Structure formats: structure tokens, C-alpha cells
Curated annotation (Swiss-Prot):
Residues 128-247 form the PX domain. Residues 25-36 have a biased composition (Polar residues). Disulfide bonds: none annotated. The PX domain binds phosphatidylinositol 3-phosphate, which is necessary for peripheral membrane localization. Present with 2210 molecules/cell in log phase SD medium. The lineage of its organism: Eukaryota, Fungi, Dikarya, Ascomycota, Saccharomycotina. The keyword Transport applies. It comes from the Eukaryota. GO terms for molecular function: identical protein binding; phosphatidylinositol-3-phosphate binding. GO terms for cellular component: cytoplasm; cytosol; endosome; endosome membrane; nucleus. InterPro entries: PX_dom (IPR001683), PX_dom_sf (IPR036871), SNX8/Mvp1 (IPR028662), SNX8/Mvp1_PX (IPR035704), Snx8_BAR_dom (IPR045734). This is Sorting nexin MVP1. It is found in: Cytoplasm; Endosome membrane. Disruption phenotype: Fails in retromer-mediated sorting of VPS10. It comes from Saccharomyces cerevisiae (strain ATCC 204508 / S288c) (Baker's yeast).
Length: 511
């Protein structure tokens, strides 16, 4: 994935503002994006009414503030407040007091950040057992195109729902598709899992494909239910609890699809905690997500190939067993018992070899079942999480743009017009009021878009923070991989040792 240099709002290199007397000029000619969000947004007053008629109170940062970008955190965001010099105090004492206050603010901010991070990470436990089971209903519906139905059962009581003995609903693939579309509308800056592909026609009757799709749907819904935000969504809970046909319910019900930022304001506490390093970490992750996915996909692919090789080994050993059995039937004809009584002992040992092949074949078959049933899903779930993170990167790049830079420039130009109109008797009062209303509208838009940009920043930081917990999925996957291989290698070794001991008395001479 390309880095976000130059087009990403986390980048600070292309968004600087410079002040020249009373004029503010942008130093970049880039297209409108979050790069242009101006000012130390901490100074914006969200409590100021948006319809005020005052020209310079509460709507915009001052020109001094506009020198910095919202994405440029090289200076203390609160450095402009609470730092005035106290009269009648020596200069060196003032510096000490200011430094002490700054150090105290930094320490408090660090402590708040640590608490915030720990609290966010505690809400996400990807290693927890799945709480949703999906089973395919054998009977297929549909006149022209047959479709599969799924029994979706939750094993525990769901949040914000009344206890019920009946925990099973019937859903179609299209219902899962609707749910994901709703989640994307409501939470565009969250890690929304992907769905397995849907195929039409004869492929829908392919049992292997249907099995993979069912497993993919199970991973999707369980990832949703492990997400601290998505799991409490009312439509997710509706999806899991409403027993009626969901298509009919959607036609009758009225539900809200507005995104989670509606009527929400950024907290001052979060703005105090913010650090530029978060943006750098985000961009580093974005730059390597494709490589990470490719490497992990290849690891998972090798695991699946290993499973197929073991299955091939099972088939070969079954064939080997049949051949040994058939061969033991013809040996008495090659070596008549009347001349070779040792052939009976050899045949008895061939029966032991046949039993060994049967046992080791059974062990290998059990190994493939454990790989496909328990081990492989642990690797694939991490693939799904990486894919959801990459999709978040892509949506962020597309949807996080705004035109704050242009609005600020527009406000400054209109303010200059108002200044030039003062004292001129030939100026229309209606024109003056019109420009004034435009300024107020632009200022309102700046505050709204800047607030949205900060909410996006907070949302994405939350997602990237809970994503850090998924590193332990790597640990669990390889631990289980090592245990599985060790256990089955031990079982196979034990069978081989038993075979060696058993056939050591096999005749090697007539004596």
C-alpha cells in the first residue's frame, strides 16, 4: 500500500500555514483533504452558538493558531493557555514556573494516555471463544435459484437483550450482506470484517464451497461480536434475535443508518492526550499492511498444502495396506508351506505391518481433521483481521477528506471585503449582510468539519489500539500448530517403535 505522504491528514509536512500581517496564506496547492484542517483545534470553542453575529469570537482560531495544522503536534496543544507571565516575579522564576507547569501537564497527559489505552485494550479479547454457531439447513429454498439458509445460534445472553430460552434464528447470505452494509454506514472508520464471497448457479450446490462459506460467515459474525463497539449495535442484536424473516422485518421497520459521529463532539481530554507518534505508527502500519497480508496468506496456504499432503499420505497408506494384504495371500503359493514353514511367520508379521499402516493412517486422518477444524481457522481469523484493517485504511483515505483549508481562505477574503466596505456610503447594506452570513456559514462548517476530523482521529486510534491485542492471535496459532504436530509426531513415532519391536523376530533364515 502506498504511504500517505502528501495526501493523508496524518501527514504534517504539506499543511503548514504562514501568517503575513493580517493575511493567512496556505503554503500548499493540494486538493481539499484533511491536510487542510487548520489550527490548534484545542482552542475552538464548541459551546459558542453557531448563529452568533459577532465577527471574531468563537468561530475560528486566531491567525496565530492558524500557523499550525491540526495534524502538526510539534508544539504543546495547550501551550497557548494558562501560560501568561505573572507580574512582579523575576524572569528566571517565571521560566521555572512555566517549565514546571508544562512538565506537570506532560506527566498528567502521559498518565491519562496510559489509562485510556489500557481501558480501550481491555474491551477487546480476540482470544475468547466464539459465541455464535452457524449451521447450514439442509433444505434449500427458491424457485429459480436455490439458496441456503443458516441456523444462527448465540451461546450466551447478548448485551442489552432480554433473556430468552430460544437463541436461534434463520438467516440467508443476503441478510449477512445487509448487516455488513449497515455497519459500514454506521461505522465507516471501524474494522468491519469481510464476508466470504457469494457465488451463483451450480457453484451454490458445491458442498465444499458451501462449507467454506458457512465457516467464513461464522468468522464474520464472531469478529463482529468480539468488537467492543459493533457487538452493542442495536441492528446487530436485532440480526441475532429477531426470529421473523429479516427481509420482511426490514421492509416494515424504521431504523437509523447515520454514522456514529452524528451529534457527537470531541472531548478536550482526548485532544490533550494526542501525540504525533500515533500518526507515524498509523502510517507505518498502512505502508506494510499489504506485505503483512501476503506473507500471512502464504503461511496459511502452506498449512493447507500440508493438510492436503497428509490426506494424500492417508490414501497411499490405505492402498499400501491393501497391497500388503493381497501379497500375503499369494506368498504361500510362491513358498509352499511343505518346503518353507517360515512363510507362515512372515505372513503373520505382514499382518502386523498391515495393522500398523491402518493405525498410522487413522492418526494421519485425525491430524487432517484437527488441522482443518481447529488449527487452520486460527490462522484464517488473523487474515480476516488484517483484511478488515486494510479496508479501514482504504476507507479512511477516501472518506476522511474535507475542505477546511479552502473555507479558511474564503473566510479571510470575505473579512477583507467587509473591512473594505466599512465607511463607504455607496455600499449596499444587503450586500454587507450577505457576506457576513457567508462568513458565519463558513465558520460553522469549519467547526463541524474540524470536529469530525478529530472524531475520526479518535475513532481510528481506538481501532488501532484494539488491533494491538490481535498480536496474541499469532502466538495462539503457532502454539497450537506446534502442539498439534508434536502430539501427532509422538503418536506416529510410538507406532513405528512398536512395529520395529514386533517384527524384529521376523524370520531371516531357516535356522
Amino acid at each position: 500500500m502506498d504511504n500517505y505522504e502528501g495526501s493523508d491528514p496524518w501527514n504534517t509536512s504539506s499543511n503548514a500555514w504562514t501568517k503575513d500581517d493580517d493575511h493567512v496564506v496556505s503554503t500548499t496547492n493540494s486538493e481539499p483533504s484533511l491536510n487542510g484542517i487548520s489550527g490548534e483545534f484545542n482552542t475552538l470553542n464548541f459551546s459558542t452558538p453557531l448563529d452568533t453575529n459577532e465577527e471574531d469570537t468563537g468561530f475560528l482560531p486566531t491567525n496565530d493558531v492558524l500557523e499550525e495544522s491540526i495534524w502538526d503536534d510539534s508544539r504543546n496543544p495547550l501551550g497557548a493557555t494558562g501560560m501568561s507571565q505573572t507580574p512582579n516575579i523575576a524572569a528566571n522564576e517565571t521560566v521555572i514556573d512555566k517549565n514546571d507547569a508544562r512538565d506537570q501537564n506532560i506527566e498528567e497527559s502521559e498518565a491519562d494516555l496510559l489509562d485510556w489505552t489500557n481501558n480501550v485494550r481491555k474491551t477487546y479479547r480476540p482470544l475468547d471463544a466464539d459465541i455464535i454457531i452457524i449451521e447450514e439447513i439442509p433444505e434449500r429454498e427458491g424457485l429459480l435459484f436455490k439458496h441456503a439458509n443458516y441456523l444462527v445460534k448465540h451461546l450466551i445472553a447478548l448485551p442489552s437483550t432480554s433473556p430468552s430460552e430460544e437463541r436461534t434464528v434463520v438467516r440467508r447470505y443476503s441478510d449477512f450482506l445487509w448487516l455488513r452494509e449497515i455497519l459500514l454506514k454506521r461505522y465507516p472508520f471501524r474494522m468491519i470484517p469481510e464476508l466470504p464471497p457469494k457465488r451463483i448457479g451450480s457453484q451454490n450446490a458445491d458442498q465444499l464451497f458451501l462449507k467454506k462459506r458457512r465457516i467464513g460467515l461464522s468468522r464474520f459474525i464472531n469478529l463482529v461480536m468480539k468488537h467492543p463497539k459493533l457487538s452493542n449495535d442495536d441492528l446487530v442484536l436485532t440480526f441475532l434475535t429477531v426470529r421473523t424473516d429479516l427481509t420482511s422485518w426490514r421492509k416494515q421497520a424504521t431504523y437509523d443508518t447515520s454514522n456514529e459521529f452524528a451529534d457527537k463532539k470531541i472531548s478536550q481530554e482526548f485532544m490533550k492526550m494526542w501525540k504525533k507518534e500515533f500518526a507515524e505508527q498509523w502510517n507505518q502500519a498502512a505502508s506494510c499492511i499489504d506485505t503483512s497480508m501476503e506473507l500471512w496468506y502464504r503461511i496459511t496456504l502452506l498449512l493447507e498444502r500440508h493438510e492436503k499432503r497428509i490426506m494424500q499420505m492417508v490414501h497411499e497408506r490405505n492402498f499400501f495396506e491393501t497391497l500388503v494384504d493381497n501379497f500375503s495371500e499369494v506368498t504361500p503359493k510362491l513358498y509352499p508351506v511343505q518346503q518353507n514353514d517360515t512363510i507362515l511367520d512372515i505372513n503373520n508379521n505382514l499382518s502386523i505391518i498391515k495393522k500398523h499402516l491402518e493405525t498410522t493412517s487413522s492418526i494421519c486422518k485425525q491430524e487432517t481433521e484437527e488441522i482443518s477444524g481447529t488449527l487452520s481457522p486460527k490462522f484464517k481469523i488473523f487474515t480476516d483481521i488484517l483484511l478488515s484493517l486494510r479496508s479501514l485504511f482504504e476507507r479512511y483515505k477516501i472518506m476522511a477528506a474535507n475542505n477546511v483549508v479552502e473555507l479558511q481562505r474564503h473566510v479571510e477574503l470575505n473579512k477583507e471585503k467587509l473591512e473594505s466596505m466599512k465607511g463607504k456610503p455607496d455600499v449596499s447594506g444587503a450586500e454587507y449582510d450577505r457576506i457576513k452570513k457567508i462568513i458565519q456559514k463558513d465558520r460553522r462548517s469549519i467547526i463541524e468539519q474540524s470536529n469530525r476530523a478529530w472524531l475520526i482521529r479518535q475513532c481510528i486510534l481506538e481501532e488501532f489500539t484494539i488491533f494491538q491485542e490481535t498480536q496474541f492471535l499469532i502466538t495462539r496459532a503457532f502454539q497450537d500448530w506446534a502442539k498439534l504436530n508434536s502430539n501427532h509426531a509422538g503418536l506416529k513415532l510410538n507406532e513405528w517403535e512398536k512395529l520395529v519391536t514386533s517384527i524384529m523376530d521376523m524370520p531371516i533364515s531357516r535356522e
